[in-house]
C-alpha cells in the first residue's frame, strides 16, 4: 500500500466522507481557527520551531509536515502484534520482542488494518506500553527508543498516536517531555492515569545478597529508593532509558550481579525472576500519560474536560499573578502549573539605576485547568491571559481520565 503523505486522506478513511464526517471536519476547522486566534502572538516561538533538529536518515524532507514519501528506509518491517490472552490491553512479545524505532527507522509505513498505531518510548514490557494499551485497547503498539522518535513517528504518519508520560505522583514531572511538547506541534487529545507496580528483577537463581547494583529508569529508581534501603540493598544505582530496557539489558548480557526495577510483565518477557514484588515507596504510585495526535479533537461540554496551555512573558514572572487571577475570577480550577527555562531567552538582563545590573532566569509556564475550550469561561480566561503574555499556545483540550483505579490493581501484567 502506498505510504501516506501530506496529500493522503485521513488514516483509515477508505470510504467517501459522509455528511456526519463533513460536519465533524467543519467543527474541527472552527476549533483550529479558535486555537489560531489564541496563539497569534507566537512570533518569537516560531523562530525556535525553526531550529535544526537531529538529521533523520533516509532523506526526510519535512519533519513537521507529511511530505516524506522519499524517506523510505529499506528493510523496515512493522510486524502486526499478537495480542496476549492473559491481558488484552497490551500486546504479547514474549517470543519475539519488537525492536524499538530509532531515528534511522523514521520512514512512512503501510497501514495494518483499522487498528490505531500508537508510538511509545521504551521496549516491550514498559509502563508506557501498558498506558498505550489502556488508552487504546485495540492498538498496535510501536516501541521507540527515544521520546523524540515517538513524536516524529506521529508527525511522519508512521503512527497515528503517541502516548507520553508527563508526571508521576512520587517522582514529579518529566521535564524533558514538557520541552518536547513545546518543540513539536502535536496536540494533546486525551490523558490516562496508570497505577505503577514496581518489582525487583534478576536472572534465575540470583540472590539479593549477591547484587552489586540496581538499574532502572531514573523515575523508577527515585520511586523505590526508601524500599531498596529497607531491603538492605545499599548498592550502586544506575539509570537507563526505561524500566523494561533495564530488564532486557540484564537478560541479554547475562548479568548475575545486577537487578532491575521493572514490571512483572517485563520479567515474563525477558525470563527474569521477581526477587521482591511491589517495591514502590508508595502504594498509590500513579503516572499520568497524555495522548498525542496530529490534529486536535473538538472540545465538548457533556463530560469533564481539561485544557493544557503554555505561556511566557517578555518581562519575566511578574505577570504570573495576573494570569492566575484570570482563572480564579471565573472559578476555573488549576490542576497543574509547571515552570521550565525559556531556551530562547534563558537569561534576562535588567539595568536599574538604583541597584545596578541584575540577571534573572526566564521561564515558560505550563498550566492545566479543568474546563473545556467549548466553554465561554475558558475562552474568556484565555483571552484575558493573552493580554498579559507575549506567548500563548493551547496544547490541547481533552477529556479527563475519570477511570477509577485501585493501588492493588497494578500494571504488573
Curated annotation (Swiss-Prot):
GO molecular function annotation: arogenate dehydratase activity; prephenate dehydratase activity
EC annotation from Swiss-Prot or TrEMBL: 4.2.1.51, 4.2.1.91
Catalytic activity: L-arogenate + H(+) = L-phenylalanine + CO2 + H2O; prephenate + H(+) = 3-phenylpyruvate + CO2 + H2O
GO cellular component, one term: chloroplast stroma
Listed Pfam families: PDT
CDD domains, alphabetized: ACT_CM-PDT, PBP2_Ct-PDT_like
Domain of life: Eukaryota
Sequence ranges assigned to domain Prephenate dehydratase in this UniProt record: 117-294
Organism: Arabidopsis thaliana
GO terms (BP aspect): L-phenylalanine biosynthetic process
Pathway, per record: Amino-acid biosynthesis; L-phenylalanine biosynthesis; L-phenylalanine from L-arogenate: step 1/1; Amino-acid biosynthesis; L-phenylalanine biosynthesis; phenylpyruvate from prephenate: step 1/1
Occurrences of domain ACT (ranges): 308-399
Tissue: Expressed in roots, leaves, stems, flowers and siliques.
Main location: plastid
Function of the protein: Converts the prephenate produced from the shikimate-chorismate pathway into phenylalanine. Dehydratase that uses arogenate and prephenate as substrates. Utilzes more efficiently arogenate than prephenate.
SUPFAM superfamilies per the UniProt record, alphabetical: ACT-like, Periplasmic binding protein-like II
Stored InterPro entries: ACT-like_dom_sf, ACT_dom, Preph_deHydtase, Preph_deHydtase_CS
The name this protein goes by in its record: Arogenate dehydratase/prephenate dehydratase 6, chloroplastic
UniProtKB keywords: Amino-acid biosynthesis, Aromatic amino acid biosynthesis, Chloroplast, Lyase, Phenylalanine biosynthesis, Plastid, Transit peptide
Location(s) in or outside the cell: Plastid, Chloroplast stroma
Transit peptide (first-last residue): 1-44
Key word Ribonucleoprotein present: no
Amino acid at each position: 500500500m502506498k505510504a501516506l503523505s501530506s496529500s493522503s486522506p485521513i488514516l483509515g478513511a477508505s470510504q467517501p466522507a459522509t455528511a456526519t464526517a463533513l460536519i465533524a471536519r467543519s467543527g474541527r476547522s472552527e476549533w483550529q481557527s479558535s486555537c489560531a486566534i489564541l496563539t497569534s502572538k507566537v512570533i518569537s516561538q516560531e523562530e525556535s520551531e525553526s531550529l535544526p533538529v537531529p538529521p533523520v536518515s533516509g532523506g526526510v524532507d519535512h519533519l513537521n509536515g507529511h511530505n516524506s514519501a522519499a524517506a523510505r528506509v529499506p528493510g523496515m518491517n512493522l510486524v502486526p502484534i499478537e495480542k496476549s490472552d492473559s491481558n488484552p490491553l497490551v500486546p504479547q512479545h514474549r517470543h519475539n520482542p519488537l525492536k524499538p524505532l530509532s531515528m534511522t527507522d523514521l520512514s512512512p509505513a503501510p497501514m495494518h488494518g483499522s487498528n490505531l498505531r500508537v508510538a511509545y518510548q521504551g521496549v516491550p514490557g514498559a509502563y508506557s506500553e501498558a498506558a498505550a494499551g489502556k488508552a487504546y485497547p485495540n492498538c498496535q503498539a510501536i516501541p521507540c527508543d527515544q521520546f523524540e522518535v515517538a513524536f516524529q513517528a506521529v508527525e511522519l504518519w508512521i503512527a497515528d498516536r503517541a502516548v507520553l508520560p508527563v508526571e508521576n505522583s512520587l517522582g514529579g514531572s518529566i521535564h524533558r517531555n514538557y520541552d518536547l511538547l513545546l518543540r513539536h506541534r502535536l496536540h494533546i487529545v486525551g490523558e490516562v492515569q496508570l497505577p505503577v507496580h514496581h518489582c525487583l528483577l534478576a536472572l534465575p537463581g540470583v540472590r539479593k545478597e549477591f547484587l552489586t547494583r540496581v538499574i532502572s529508569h531514573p523515575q523508577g529508581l527515585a520511586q523505590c529508593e526508601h524500599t531498596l534501603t529497607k531491603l538492605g540493598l545499599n548498592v550502586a544505582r544506575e539509570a537507563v532509558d526505561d524500566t523494561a530496557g533495564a530488564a532486557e539489558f540484564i537478560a541479554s548480557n547475562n548479568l548475575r550481579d545486577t537487578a532491575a526495577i521493572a514490571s512483572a510483565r517485563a520479567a515474563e518477557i525477558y525470563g527474569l525472576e521477581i526477587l521482591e514484588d511491589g517495591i514502590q515507596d508508595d502504594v498509590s504510585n500513579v503516572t499520568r500519560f497524555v495522548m498525542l495526535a496530529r490534529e486536535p479533537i473538538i472540545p465538548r461540554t457533556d463530560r469533564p474536560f481539561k485544557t493544557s496551555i503554555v505561556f511566557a512573558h517578555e518581562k519575566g514572572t511578574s505577570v504570573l499573578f495576573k494570569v492566575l487571577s484570570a482563572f480564579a475570577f471565573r472559578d476555573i480550577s488549576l490542576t497543574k502549573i509547571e515552570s521550565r527555562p525559556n531556551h530562547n531567552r534563558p537569561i534576562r538582563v535588567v539595568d536599574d539605576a538604583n541597584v545596578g545590573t541584575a540577571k534573572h532566569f526566564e521561564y515558560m509556564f505550563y498550566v492545566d485547568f479543568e474546563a473545556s475550550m467549548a466553554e465561554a469561561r475558558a475562552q474568556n480566561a484565555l483571552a484575558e491571559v493573552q493580554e498579559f503574555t507575549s506567548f500563548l499556545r493551547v496544547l490541547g483540550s481533552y477529556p479527563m481520565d475519570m477511570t477509577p483505579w485501585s493501588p492493588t490493581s497494578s500494571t504488573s501484567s
